[in-house]
C-alpha cells in the first residue's frame, strides 16, 4: 500500500528532465557509477557496524520504555510456507523492492524535497518517511539510519543504482537472519 501511494505521488510530479519520460525514477546510469559500485564493499563494511550499534541502542531505548521488540511481519510471513514461497519472497526482497523503494524515496521524494528544503532537510524528512512507512517500531531507528546512508550514497554517486545495491544487501542480510 505504501509503495503504491508513494508511486502515485511521484507519478504526479509535473516536471520532467529532458529526454526522460519519468525523471522521478532517476535510474539512468551516471558517469561516476562504476566508481560508486566499486566502492560498495567499503560502504557496506562501514554501514553494518553503524547499523548494529544503532539497532542495539534503539532496542535498549525500546526495552527501557517497555515497548515490544517484534520483527517486521513481512520478514516472518514466508518462513513457514515452504521453499518456493521463501524463494519468491527473497527474490522480491532482494531484487524488486530495492529498485522500487530507491526510485521512489531517493529518486523521487528526496530529489523533490531537496529543491525546496535543501539537502539536510530533504535527507531527514525523506529518511523519516521511509522509516515510518516500514510500519515497525522496533526497526524505526535502524531503518532511518539506513535511509540517511542511502541519501549520502545517492548524493555521492549521483545515481540510485549504488543505493539499490546497498539496499538489496541490507534486505538480503535481514531476510537471511530472519
Give residue ranges: language-model regions:
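Hydrophobic core segments of transmembrane alpha-helices in multi-pass, intramembrane catalytic enzymes
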Residues: 2-5, 89-92, 142-150
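Functionally important transmembrane alpha-helices
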Residues: 120-178
